[in-house]
């Protein structure tokens, strides 16, 4: 699914009206019907009172139409229309006239805000501003937003929380942005929803399809995407019944050091649970017996040292190589890693300590073989990219670095971003907070390694891996909850995740 800028969404709306054709008021009616159905499904029939706050623009028009439809559905509602300049958009004005024919009370707020008395079982519908807002809320709008945020009520935002910008908020005052519990967004997610700083505004958000023209959507170009299940399922071929293990690649995992065998085991198990035909693990002598006992399906080879990697393994036999989980940063390991990168001619995955070593000389990334992937968490990427901190800055830097080095970058976190060498960014839609646990990244490395070994290109491997990793995490969270979730639980859930995708 494409993610669009605000102006592009306006153009898609306009093109939809032209292509169907459909009048703007009728398109608004369709959107309002979809929103109302979602609201009634979640909150209707429970003696709830709906307090609807509408602005003077088209988002307010949606809210007024919702008020009318809630009355038709037998729900009790009241409207507060904020119109300090007595100037409504044409469609908002039309929906006001339609609402006046109903029994729903309407309060017009001018330049002064008078706080209404709302009942305790109140559902607030926020329809003050849409995604087109390009400046901070002020005046009576800001007063109303602060009032809404102070209410002991469930807050539902239409399309986007009022005061939140569709792309970036800059220095917007958080007090003047609605803190929604639920956001019902239309057709596409907004880029701002995917930024950590905005989670407190959007709450749990859901995408509602309002039937915008597929032709209009196709015409608009974007380098931003939100990955959904159907897209990933379409990328997974059925296994040939005449195939053998050699058809699914031979993966090499370089991992582990004294006291860090667990990282190698998690990555190895994830590799085998993700379809690699063969797996060899280069690990120090101290971990050899542990690994062969824990992962009997894997082969091991010496890493040239008792406690850590000292000698880079030859890579000619393998279809992909991953290095980093539990590797350590000893001087001999650093030297061996740099030699391994120099010698390797197949796609590589770099994670964890491999990235910590590379951070000392980030230009080494330019030496990685074509089709390689790195998987930094925000702290690791900050070290690689010279200290960039905000998610927006990291995404921009990762996009630039991926293009410069012709690699794929998996920028881990909520809505993990896959930054491809062609400048696209794919945000993941699976995963949960319970996955913020030791070894979770090692598990992801194993999944990526398996997919590269099986012959997927770097972008496809990264997109599939983060989706499956998150899906397995969601399955594990269903079984065990967020607090108790471990990386081993994620590995154990991988068969279920793959099975879901194979249906």
Stretches found by the model and what they are:
Residues 121-123, 128-222:
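Internal gly/pro-rich beta-alpha loop/helix module
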Residues 91, 136-138, 169-170, 385-389:
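Short, solvent-exposed loop/turn segments at secondary-structure boundaries
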